[in-house]
Amino acid sequence: MAADKSASIPEVVTEAIVVIDIVESTTTSNLFGWYAVGRNIHRDLRSFVTDIGMGRGLRCVRSTGDGYLLTFFNPQSAETAAISATEAVFELLRRTEIRNREVADERSLNLRCAIHLGEVDVVLNDREGPHVSFAFRLESISRGSLPAALNPIAPEQLPLKNYVLCSEEVAGILERRSTLWSTRSIGLFRLKGFPGFREVFRVLSRQDPE
């Protein structure tokens, strides 16, 4: 009994957690059809996710219906995992931009992305724990969230699509360890299930800051 109980305890690791959401996925599928448009959008995203994860420590890929939960791991450094995750997300946005130039507007793939870092329980093809929930709360932040925030940016400064948000933990890592990206506070938010206000940042490429 003791051995069985021990075997059921999940491994705990520190990983970079990425949540990717397809903007207006359900609306697009309902309007233009899942088989005509929606399925191809999801297939393209899945292909991109597989490619960007190669060589960057991608360990978990789970569909959320309208996007993906991804985690990245580096055995030497959790901070390196956060940098790899950021690199992967911006490569994903780059490929998405190229793709969108070649398809009709209704087939465009537009994303919202969020990056966090923290301890997670490793379960088969999934991750569990409060840090996973936190990453989903980050991704859910939109222009509509700004009026309730402290010291928010102007709504027009937050794009409607194809942007990256991150937690304070990830912002600190990027500012210390990378010259490729900068971070900009968008305000302090109350995130459902988490106490107090949490500062949230937008991640920007230094090569293309806007």
Predicted regions and their residues:
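Intrinsically disordered, glycine/charged-rich C-terminal tails and inter-domain linkers
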Residues: M1-I9, T14, N151-E210
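Catalytic NTP-binding/metal-coordinating core of nucleotidyl cyclase/transferase enzymes
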Residues: A2-E87
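A generic fold-level signal
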Residues: P10-V12, S63, S108-N110, R127-G129, ...
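A generic structural signal for short hydrophobic patches within well-formed alpha-helices
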Residues: S25-T28, V120, V170-A171
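Short, glycine/charged-enriched secondary-structure capping and boundary segments
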Residues: F32-Y35, R127-H131, T179-W181
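Alpha-helical scaffold within the catalytic cores of cyclic-nucleotide enzymes
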Residues: R39-L58, N74-C113, L117-E119, P130-L146
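Short loop/turn motifs enriched for small/polar and acidic residues
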Residues: D66, A114-V120, S167-E169
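Short, solvent-exposed loop/turn segments at secondary-structure junctions
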Residues: T71, E119-L124, P147, I173
